[in-house]
Amino acid sequence: MSFQNSLSLSLVNPTHALCMVGMEITLDISKCAPDKCKSFTIRGSPRILIHISSSVIAGKEDTVVWRSMNHPTVALVRMVAPSPTVDEDKVLVSYFCPDQEVPTATAVLFLTGIEISLEADIYRDGQLDMPSDKQAKKKWMWGMNGWGAILLVNCSPNAVGQPDEQSFQEGPREIQNLSQMNVTVEGPTSILQNYQLILHTSEEEAKKTRVYWSQRGSSAYELVVGPNKPVYLLPTFENRRKEAFYVEATEFPSPSFSGLISLSLSLVEKAHDECIPEIPLYKDTVMFRVAPYIFMPSTQMPLEVYLCRELQLQGFVDSVTKLSEKSKVQVVKVYEDPNRQSKWLQDEMAFCYTQAPHKTVSLILDTPRVSKLEDFPMKYTLTPGSGYLIRQTEDHRVASLDSIGNLMVSPPVKAQGKDYPLGRVLIGGSFYPSSEGRDMNKGLREFVYAQQVQAPVELFSDWLMTGHMDQFMCFVPTNDKNNDQKDFRLLLASPSACFELFEQKQKEGYGNVTLFEDIGAEQLLSNGRESKTISQILADKSFREQNTYVEKCISLNRTLLKTELGLEDKDIILIPQLFCLEQLTNVPSNQQSTKLFARPYFPDMLQIIVLGKNLGIPKPFGPKINGTCCLEEKVCGLLEPLGLKCTFIDDFDCYLANIGDVCASAIINRVPFAFKWWKMTP
C-alpha cells in the first residue's frame, strides 16, 4: 500500500491506498467503466470528502451522487480525518447501463487516512494548536490578529564563552523554558514501516537553532537538530501518537539574520533497492520567529539595583542602597572587574528582557570594550534564571561611543500617527561623519535596529565628553494624565534656566554666595573645579559662550524628540544645569583630540536614579541661600508637585572624578512591559 496523488479504479480487485489527511487524490472514474455504461453513482465513508463536478459529497454513508458518463470524468477525493484501522474508509463507484436500476459493475477504493503534523504555539496562547489552515503555519504575522510560533534565545550565563556548536543535554527543569513542538502521527502507524519521518531545516537555519528530544525511557534530552545537524531521522513511532520536542534559538535577530526559522517534518518512502533514491511524499512546516531583546525605560518599575562595589564610590553606594530600601527594591553589589577599564557597568551593559508566550527572561546585554575577556564576573551576581548576552564592539577607545551604554529608551509613545507601545530606542552619535566624530559602530547599531520592536531614533550626543544622553535628558514617571498629558515627563538640561535662576538670586542680593561651599579646596582641584560666586559665574563671558553652545546642542535634540516621540512643550521640564568645555580626560595620549567636549560643571542633576516615584539626584553643591541649595530647591519645586520624591546623593567625586560618574556605577533591572511585542506591527 502506498501514497498516491492519482488513482485508477479496477473492477477486478479493490484498490488500496494511503491518503494523507487534507491532501487530494485524483480518482479516474471513466477508465475502468464497462463499455455500455452511461452513468454512475459515487459515495464515500464519513471521513471522506468527494468533489465531483459542482457537487460535494461529505459526512453521510447514504449520500449518493448520480452522474452521466458522456465524457471522461474524474473525482477529487480527500480524507478529512485519520482512519482508526487499515482499510477502514472506502469509496464506492457503481456503473449503470441505460434503463437498468441494478449496477452492472462496482469498483471499490479502500483508503487508510494518516495525519502527520508539526504542532507549535501558533496562536501565542500557550496552547499547541492544530490550525484549520495548515498553510498558516508556514507564515509568521505581526499584530493583534497575527499568528506564528516564537523561540527564545538560550542566554544562560553558563553558556557564555562556550562555542555555539556545542551539543548540550538539557535537564527537565531547563527544558521547560524552551518552546515546545509536537510531532503528531494519527492513524494506523503499523503501515508506515516502509516510510521514514525526517525532522529537518536548512543548514543555515540549523546554525541558529537547537531542537531537543527525550526518547522514551531516557531522562536526558538529546540534541537532534542544530549546528552541523540540519537533519534527523526519527525512529518508528510504533503505537505512540505524539512526541514532544523542545526548541531554542542560538542568536537574536541581526543585520544578517531576519529572526525567522522554519522547521519541517517530511515523510519519505524508502526504496527497496539501494540504487533507487527515496521518494518525498509529504512535508509539514512551522515558521518560528526568534523573540527580540527589549529595553526598558526608566519609567518602568524597578526590580533590582546593581551597584559597583568600589571603595571610591562608597558614598554613592550607601546613598543608593538607602534609596533602594526606601523603594523596596533589592540591591545587588557587583565587584569591580580588574580586566575592564574603570567605566564599565552601565557604560558597557544594559538590562533588557526577551519574551515568548510561555516565558519571560531577564538578561544582561554586555558590550565589552576590552577584547578577549576570559571571564565575565557580572554573570555570577545575576538573579537565577537571568540571561547573559555578549556583543563584541569594534572601537575600544576609552571615549568611544561604541557600547550599549550609549542608548536610552523612551516610554511608550505615539508619534506621527504611529504607536510605539514598547517605546523607542534613542542612540547617541555624531549626527554626521567627521574625522573626530564618535558613533556606535554600524554592526552594533544595526543589531539594535534588527530587533524591530523599538524603532530607534538617532540623537546628537557627540558634543558630550562621555557621549551619553543621560547627561542632558531623563524620563520620569507621573500619574498626571489630565488635559491629555502623558504619564511621564522628559527632563532636559537647561543652561539658560540655570543662568536665569542665578540672575534672579543675584537681584535678590545673593550674588556673593558661592558654589561648592562644602567641598574642600583639594577635592575641587582634583576635579578641575574652583569655588566661584554667583556673580563671578554670571560675569564669565567665555563660560556663557560655552553654555550657549551646549544649549544649541540640547535644542537640536529637543526638536528631534518632540517630532519622533510626539512630545509637546508641556511634556518637557527644564532642569537647571551648567556645563563647561574641556579636552578628553583620563585617556591615553594617542587617543587625545584637540576637540573640546562638554562636561557637567557641577554634578549632573539629569543623571537620576529613577526608582518609581523616588528619585536619586546627584547633589549639585549649588549656592546655599538661607541654608538651602537654590538648585535643589528649584528642582524639588519642579518635580515634587508631580508626586515625585527627590533625594540628593552626596558624593561629589562620584560624579566628577576621573573614575567615572553615576552612569558607570549602577544599572537597574526593571519590570517588563505588559504589552506583548508580537501584538505590535513594526
Swiss-Prot record:
Keywords: Cytoplasm, Cytoplasmic vesicle, Nucleus, Phosphoprotein
Description of post-translational modifications: Phosphorylation at Ser-2, possibly by RSK-type kinases, and Ser-434 creates binding sites for 14-3-3 proteins.
Matches recorded under InterPro entries: Cupredoxin, PAD, PAD_C, PAD_central_sf, PAD_N, PAD_N_sf, Prot_Arg_deaminase_cen_dom
One Pfam family of this chain: PAD_M
Molecular-function annotations in GO: calcium ion binding; identical protein binding; structural constituent of cytoplasmic lattice; tubulin binding
GO CC field: cortical granule; cytoplasm; cytoplasmic lattice; intermediate filament cytoskeleton; nucleus; ooplasm
Keyword Translocase attributed: no
UniProt note on tissues of expression: Expressed at very high levels in oocytes. Weakly expressed in testis. Expressed in primordial, primary, secondary and Graafian follicles, and in immature oocytes, mature eggs and blastocyst (at protein level).
GO biological process, one term: protein localization
SUPFAM superfamilies in alphabetical order: Cupredoxins (SSF49503), Pentein (SSF55909), Peptidylarginine deiminase Pad4, middle domain (SSF110083)
Keyword Nucleus attributed: yes
Phosphoserine modifications at: 2, 434
Effects seen without this gene: Female mice exhibit dispersal of the cytoskeletal sheets in oocytes that lead to a failure of zygotes to progress beyond the 2-cell stage and infertility. Oocytes are depleted of many proteins required for early development, such as ribosomal proteins and proteins that control epigenetic reprogramming of the preimplantation embryo. Male fertility is not affected: knockout animals are viable and present at the expected Mendelian ratio and do not exhibit any overt abnormalities.
Localisation per UniProt entry: Cytoplasm; Nucleus; Cytoplasmic vesicle, Secretory vesicle, Cortical granule
Effect of residue 620 to A: Embryos of female knockin mice stop development at the two-cell stage. Mutant oocytes display defects of epigenetic reprogramming and zygotic genome activation
Family that this chain belongs to: Belongs to the protein arginine deiminase family.
PANTHER family, per the entry: PEPTIDYLARGININE DEIMINASE (PTHR10837), PROTEIN-ARGININE DEIMINASE TYPE-6 (PTHR10837:SF4)
Function: Structural constituent of cytoplasmic lattices, which plays a key role in early embryonic development. Cytoplasmic lattices consist in fibrous structures found in the cytoplasm of oocytes and preimplantation embryos. They are required to store maternal proteins critical for embryonic development, such as ribosomal proteins and proteins that control epigenetic reprogramming of the preimplantation embryo, and prevent their degradation or activation. In contrast to other members of the family, does not show protein-arginine deiminase activity due to its inability to bind Ca(2+).
Subunit description: Homodimers. Associates with alpha-tubulin.
Protein name: Inactive protein-arginine deiminase type-6
Organism: Mus musculus
